[in-house]
Amino acid sequence: MSDYVIECHNLETAYVGSLNRPILNEISCHIKQGEFVVLLGLNGAGKSTLLRSLVGLVPLVKGEVHINGVAMNSRILPQIRRDVGMLFQGGGLIPQLSAIENVLCGRLGTRTTWQTLFGFPKRDRLLALELLEQLGLRELAYQRTSKLSGGQQQRVAIARALIQSPQILLADEPTTGLDVIATQQVMETLAELHTQQGMTVVAVLHDLGMAARYAQRAIVLDAGRIVYEGSCDNLQAQFVVNSQ
């Protein structure tokens, strides 16, 4: 059995006329179980597109994505999306709902209409409360998310991603729009999931210092191609070299 939980083989998306190239162009990379990997690059490099392709949210014209050794296809996509938690840029919460209700939304994909018609099962609600408690938000469980701070909202979004008990967590610019304190709280949460629970974390970041502090490995993209893959040491030099 492969040591890799994520494998990308020659991924290519459709040609984009405004860019004169595909957004992703012959992308191949591998991520091991329990790694914390960051995707870096300038705006438009293809970071978020690559991340979303890992859960079938981006159509590919060429290449394959393998999750846990299985090639992604429409038949197994629902299972893959249960195994892979996704933290979208901005959180994607419903502001009118409470924190716990937003977390429970993460269960909608595995519950039938009849199961949710009269509310979520008690075990789901208990799990949601447990996750919020682990993230320091137990006392805010019934507060509308619109009244929470940016950092608190992002931690609610993390809890929502975790309610499926995923093996892998994908985070698309999880600190965008957050202040320094909230940014640190979110990154510490991701780091704890990695170090304490052995979760595989793949995050799109812009802050090179943050990447070097928390991640084990970096994948740097430029114009839809991987230009560096390796240690997070001296990442600034990689951007200087690749811009010349």
Swiss-Prot record:
GO molecular function: ABC-type phosphonate transporter activity; ATP binding; ATP hydrolysis activity
Main enzyme class: translocase
Catalytic reaction equation(s): phosphonate(out) + ATP + H2O = phosphonate(in) + ADP + phosphate + H(+)
Residues reported to bind ATP: G41, L42, N43, G44, A45, G46, K47, S48
Sorted UniProt keywords: ATP-binding, Cell inner membrane, Cell membrane, Membrane, Nucleotide-binding, Phosphonate transport, Translocase, Transport
Ranges where the ABC transporter domain occurs: 6-244
Pfam families assigned: ABC_tran
Cellular localisation: Cell inner membrane
InterPro entries, per the entry: AAA+_ATPase, ABC_transporter-like_ATP-bd, ABC_transporter-like_CS, ABC_transpr_LolD-like, ABC_transpr_PhnC, P-loop_NTPase
CC terms in the record's Gene Ontology section: plasma membrane
Entry's EC annotation: 7.3.2.2
Principal cellular location given in the protein's record: membrane
Membrane topology of this protein: Peripheral membrane protein
Family to which this protein belongs: Belongs to the ABC transporter superfamily. Phosphonates importer (TC 3.A.1.9.1) family.
Subunit (UniProt): The complex is composed of two ATP-binding proteins (PhnC), two transmembrane proteins (PhnE) and a solute-binding protein (PhnD).
Main function: Part of the ABC transporter complex PhnCDE involved in phosphonates import. Responsible for energy coupling to the transport system.
PANTHER family noted in UniProt: IMPORT ATP-BINDING PROTEIN
Protein name, as recorded: Phosphonates import ATP-binding protein PhnC
Organism: Trichormus variabilis (strain ATCC 29413 / PCC 7937) (Anabaena variabilis)
Name of the gene encoding the protein in the UniProt record: phnC
